Amino acid sequence: MVSAEVPSVEVLSAGTLLEGTEVRIVDEGRTDREERQVGEIAIRCESLFSGYFKDPETTAQSLHDGWYFSGDLGFMADGHLFITGRKKDLLIIAGKNYYPQDIERIVSAIPGIHPGRVVALGWDDASIGTQRLIVLAEVESESKVDDPALAATVRTELAGELDCAIDDLRLLPHMWLLKTSSGKIARAPNLKRFLEVFGKSAP
């Protein structure tokens, strides 16, 4: 039995597999995982591409024994494929794995935070041997920029939902965060901007 108090999130199916397509869900060692366990999605089919153009290194990393290791994370359940995120985006904080989308969803729902204008980032800190968690969140009004009460609420909500502590939280004015050409919040460019703007005061 699972308590109704346990936080959950709805995940939509990407659909069932096309005829002639095989999918495996694998761990870091590329060993198959059980159904409903999250891992990297590997695909094999007759129409699979043979490699990346003039990029043998990426080809060798992604293609092996007829399988394409996509870098996407997901799981299989009752014949349906569910995609949960990107492997490269996974945050590893003090030995625990966190999906940035989970952090962003929780913070976005807090009153005073601009919905959908939050990004959770991992910054590799060699001095402690793990990533530090950075959360950049745009606020709905200028009066909430760097507001200590709102910052405390964000930290408390995240700790309560995910048992996760933020190393560096920035409450920012609207339109501070950078987006991709498709309108999504851009992770790498925002990490770069964070380090350029706040680098000297970062933990």
List PLM regions with ranges.
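AMP-binding/adenylate-forming catalytic core of the ANL superfamily
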Residues: 45, 50-51, 73-162
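Alpha-helical "lid/cap" subdomains adjacent to substrate-binding clefts that gate access
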Residues: 1-13, 139-141
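Short conserved micro-motifs at the rims of enzyme active sites and ligand-binding pockets
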Residues: 53-54, 146, 181-182
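Conserved C-terminal "lid"/linker of ANL adenylate-forming enzymes
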Residues: 117-124, 134-135, 155-203
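Conserved ATP-binding/catalytic segment of the ANL
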Residues: 11-36, 40-100
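Short, solvent-exposed cationic patches
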Residues: 54-57, 105, 200-203
